């Protein structure tokens, strides 16, 4: 079994294929209904090979959630770093959270989040991932605010409190966006989030993304 993964590069590629497959199945069926056999079939692998890489179903699924979040942040970092102003960077971050048409947007991620929250009270491994993701979100927002304050773009608000408030607001839009609530679509969620952010931080937001 040791040789089935092939070279180190092939092993990494195969592992990522399985993680992608796991994410697709979780989005389609939900975390509780995702089985190793489903993931193996989607990845074009045997169940034994999936077990070789991940040992257990829970480990496979928690690693898939972690992999999804890491990939999202890689895209977010690249897009944010390409923008010069802190206000523009914060707008890009919120757009990626709310607008699924954005590259790396969170449409499928929201469905994963619904499962993440549902499983957290009953699964310590999932709860630990949720906590780390929450901390990462807040730290990203906090850093953007502090950088903007140093540049004179943002008002002198408490960056930690703002990060908690904005992340909670974005979390609040998860359910209606994920469930396609006609009263709170992605563009509306983006607009309301940016109204809150610009009002608290004292910068102008023209809402151009919401109308694109």
Question: Where are the regions that the model predicts?
Answer:
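Short coil/turn segments at alpha/beta junctions that flank glycine-rich nucleotide-binding fingerprints
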Residues: 28-32, 83, 151
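Hydrophobic alpha-helical connector segments
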Residues: 63, 74-110, 162-166, 190, ...
């Amino acid at each position: 079994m040791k040789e089935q993964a092939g070279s180190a590069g092939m092993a990494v590629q195969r592992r990522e294929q399985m993680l992608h497959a796991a994410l697709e199945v979780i989005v389609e069926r939900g975390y509780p209904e995702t089985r190793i056999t489903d993931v193996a079939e989607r990845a074009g692998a045997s169940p034994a090979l999936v077990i070789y890489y991940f040992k257990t179903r829970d480990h496979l699924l928690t690693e898939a959630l972690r992999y999804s979040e890491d990939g999202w942040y890689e895209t977010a970092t690249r897009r944010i770093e390409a923008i010069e102003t802190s206000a523009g960077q914060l707008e890009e971050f919120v757009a990626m959270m709310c607008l699924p048409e954005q590259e790396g947007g969170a449409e499928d991620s929201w469905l994963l989040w619904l499962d993440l929250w549902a499983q957290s009270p009953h699964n310590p491994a999932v709860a630990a991932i949720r906590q780390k993701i929450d901390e990462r979100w807040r730290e990203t927002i906090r850093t953007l605010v502090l950088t903007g304050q140093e540049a004179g773009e943002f008002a002198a608000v408490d960056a930690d409190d703002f990060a908690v408030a904005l992340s909670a607001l974005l979390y609040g839009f998860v359910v209606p966006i994920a469930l396609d609530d006609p009263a709170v679509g992605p563009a509306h969620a983006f607009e309301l989030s940016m109204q809150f952010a610009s009002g608290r931080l004292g910068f102008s937001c023209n809402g151009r993304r919401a109308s694109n």
